[in-house]
Amino acid sequence: MENKEHHHHHHHHHHHHSNGSYVSNKVSSLADGSRVGNYQIVKTLGEGSFGKVKLAYHVTTGQKVALKIINKKVLAKSDMQGRIEREISYLRLLRHPHIIKLYDVIKSKDEIIMVIEYAGNELFDYIVQRNKMSEQEARRFFQQIISAVEYCHRHKIVHRDLKPENLLLDEHLNVKIADFGLSNIMTDGNFLKTSCGSPNYAAPEVISGKLYAGPEVDVWSCGVILYVMLCRRLPFDDESIPVLFKNISNGVYTLPKFLSPGASDLIKRMLIVNPLNRISIHEIMQDEWFKVDLAEYLVPQDLKQQEQFNKKSGNEENVEEIDDEMVVTLSKTMGYDKDEIYEALESSEDTPAYNEIRNAYILIKDNKSLIKDMKQDNNVTQELDTFLSQSPPTFQQNGDGMKASEDQKKKHSGRRLASSVTQQRTFHQPPFMDQSKEEDSTISILPTSLPQIHRANMLAQGLPAASKISPLVTKKSKTRWHFGIRSRSYPLDVMGEIYIALKNLGAEWAKPSEEDLWTIRVRWKYDSDESRLIEDGVKKIPNLMKIVIQLFQIETNNYLVDFKFDGWESTYGDSTISTNMSEDEMSTFSAYPFLHLTTKLIMELAVNSQGN
């Protein structure tokens, strides 16, 4: 079957043969007992937020895996598909003993099937079965969770939805976190996901619909999880959602007397309402209670090495050989061309494409050092085995892939990493870990000022009046960059102006719902000879571009208008028209008209506002 070959052997041209990656049989017949690729499906394990999860085993090795079946309809617009598949491939690089591994991705016409590590139990079922959990035992689970979360944050992935269903246990009672990186894929481009999965575990800034949900939201959820393990009940729990939201927003909960001072102190610092004052993951790792009996392999490299870094002068760090083996791994996993990877690593240019490659390289490099750590830590040999079996053996096609061909080796022998990459590695604590941080996103969803909108805003019942939202940071010294247009006018006036401009330009829009007053969904006819698509020999022209315009509050009395491309429709009402184009065609096709129309709109707005 050509499917798995596709993953390991394609290079840079991988998006052109879009059919190459499809499984021949239609996968929606994913009945129990059927086969997908090399996997035999056994039964359905459950229904996740993204679709069904099935238990399966690899036909030759018998290894158990779980298949997470994501229906492409749930994902963003078809023209985002390529990016989503790219993000899912990035998740394949995440290797941490306490994160569910993603072994492979199988694509069919309607689904993306993620082949992931199988862990049979949920942590919380285990807690319920034990009548009492000692602090030692709870701390061991907590250390594993925090170490995994730190690892993902370091690689710029925030979970955003840590809750009991995502905390699994393997047969050695080790925690495995599921769904890392998925909330991203679901929300991308629409700054917010309105439904937050389980409100009991959600941070105040998440339930109040604040725009920016950074790594701090995971700290809050971990605080709730620690509380539940130690107290066997939820810190925030109420029949009434408004009351629940009010308690979370105000951080109202009680700590039982039996907790040790160390534990209750840590919980208090994690459940701080203002995300800026909340403890960071790195600070948790330095907490005294946390550090008791901490397994060596759970401490990230940089925390161990920090002291040495501080002593060294920066210069001698800068020369570092590029690891050829890692380049090979990278080109296999992500489908980059090897030369492309060397180019990115040697260049000091700051382009998105280069950064993507550098991040992936650093990620693989970290995996290596993590494995080295685990080898030194004698207690974890069995864990190491499961950690290293990156995927069912048959996936390691033939050994040739791992050895760079000789001439390739000669060509690149002793190549040097551009110093900027090394520096990034040496001081790679991401900006959000920096304690001196002053800058932070102050974008928030618009407070509602009209009575009928207030009613519609179901959250308002239980939340402090939205108008009290004040900017988190009022430091004015630094120029801020924003996408879209900024405005200091009254929000309703801004919306009015936009509607007038759209009307003048002949665009149409959907009637906004009361909850969604600050979002305009626009369809705009774009006439151009290039917008012809040939489909089944018939010319169809997708000439209606969809744009979403959204108004956000950046600071008090300072608003931002955001424009987002939202796909094409043809006048025939057949919105599926774009799916036959490859992702490349789609993106080259859409960028220019989108910029063209938004520029027209911005000009129109400028003309109008001067006229007033």
Swiss-Prot record:
<keyword id="KW-0067">ATP-binding</keyword>
<dbReference type="GO" id="GO:0071940">
    <property type="term" value="P:fungal-type cell wall assembly"/>
</dbReference>
<dbReference type="InterPro" id="IPR017441">
    <property type="entry name" value="Protein_kinase_ATP_BS"/>
</dbReference>
<feature type="region of interest" description="Disordered">
    <location>
        <begin position="388"/>
        <end position="426"/>
    </location>
</feature>
<comment type="function">
    <text>Essential for release from glucose repression. It interacts and has functional relationship to the regulatory protein SNF4. Could phosphorylate CAT8.</text>
</comment>
<dbReference type="GO" id="GO:0000132">
    <property type="term" value="P:establishment of mitotic spindle orientation"/>
</dbReference>
<dbReference type="GO" id="GO:0006986">
    <property type="term" value="P:response to unfolded protein"/>
</dbReference>
<dbReference type="GO" id="GO:0016239">
    <property type="term" value="P:positive regulation of macroautophagy"/>
</dbReference>
<dbReference type="GO" id="GO:2000222">
    <property type="term" value="P:positive regulation of pseudohyphal growth"/>
</dbReference>
<dbReference type="GO" id="GO:0090606">
    <property type="term" value="P:single-species surface biofilm formation"/>
</dbReference>
<dbReference type="GO" id="GO:1900436">
    <property type="term" value="P:positive regulation of filamentous growth of a population of unicellular organisms in response to starvation"/>
</dbReference>
<dbReference type="GO" id="GO:0106310">
    <property type="term" value="F:protein serine kinase activity"/>
</dbReference>
<dbReference type="GO" id="GO:0045722">
    <property type="term" value="P:positive regulation of gluconeogenesis"/>
</dbReference>
<dbReference type="InterPro" id="IPR028375">
    <property type="entry name" value="KA1/Ssp2_C"/>
</dbReference>
<keyword id="KW-0723">Serine/threonine-protein kinase</keyword>
<feature type="compositionally biased region" description="Basic residues">
    <location>
        <begin position="1"/>
        <end position="18"/>
    </location>
</feature>
<keyword id="KW-0808">Transferase</keyword>
<protein>
    <recommendedName>
        <fullName>Carbon catabolite-derepressing protein kinase</fullName>
        <ecNumber>2.7.11.1</ecNumber>
    </recommendedName>
</protein>
<dbReference type="GO" id="GO:0004679">
    <property type="term" value="F:AMP-activated protein kinase activity"/>
</dbReference>
<keyword id="KW-0119">Carbohydrate metabolism</keyword>
<dbReference type="GO" id="GO:0005524">
    <property type="term" value="F:ATP binding"/>
</dbReference>
<keyword id="KW-0539">Nucleus</keyword>
<feature type="binding site">
    <location>
        <begin position="45"/>
        <end position="53"/>
    </location>
    <ligand>
        <name>ATP</name>
    </ligand>
</feature>
<dbReference type="GO" id="GO:0031965">
    <property type="term" value="C:nuclear membrane"/>
</dbReference>
<dbReference type="InterPro" id="IPR013896">
    <property type="entry name" value="SNF1_UBA"/>
</dbReference>
<dbReference type="GO" id="GO:0005774">
    <property type="term" value="C:vacuolar membrane"/>
</dbReference>
<feature type="region of interest" description="Disordered">
    <location>
        <begin position="1"/>
        <end position="25"/>
    </location>
</feature>
<dbReference type="GO" id="GO:0005993">
    <property type="term" value="P:trehalose catabolic process"/>
</dbReference>
<dbReference type="InterPro" id="IPR032270">
    <property type="entry name" value="AMPK_C"/>
</dbReference>
<dbReference type="GO" id="GO:0045944">
    <property type="term" value="P:positive regulation of transcription by RNA polymerase II"/>
</dbReference>
<dbReference type="GO" id="GO:0005641">
    <property type="term" value="C:nuclear envelope lumen"/>
</dbReference>
<feature type="modified residue" description="Phosphothreonine; by autocatalysis">
    <location>
        <position position="194"/>
    </location>
</feature>
<feature type="binding site">
    <location>
        <position position="68"/>
    </location>
    <ligand>
        <name>ATP</name>
    </ligand>
</feature>
<dbReference type="GO" id="GO:0000144">
    <property type="term" value="C:cellular bud neck septin ring"/>
</dbReference>
<dbReference type="GO" id="GO:0017148">
    <property type="term" value="P:negative regulation of translation"/>
</dbReference>
<dbReference type="GO" id="GO:0034976">
    <property type="term" value="P:response to endoplasmic reticulum stress"/>
</dbReference>
<dbReference type="InterPro" id="IPR011009">
    <property type="entry name" value="Kinase-like_dom_sf"/>
</dbReference>
<comment type="similarity">
    <text>Belongs to the protein kinase superfamily. CAMK Ser/Thr protein kinase family. SNF1 subfamily.</text>
</comment>
<dbReference type="GO" id="GO:0061762">
    <property type="term" value="P:CAMKK-AMPK signaling cascade"/>
</dbReference>
<keyword id="KW-0547">Nucleotide-binding</keyword>
<feature type="domain" description="Protein kinase">
    <location>
        <begin position="39"/>
        <end position="290"/>
    </location>
</feature>
<dbReference type="GO" id="GO:0042149">
    <property type="term" value="P:cellular response to glucose starvation"/>
</dbReference>
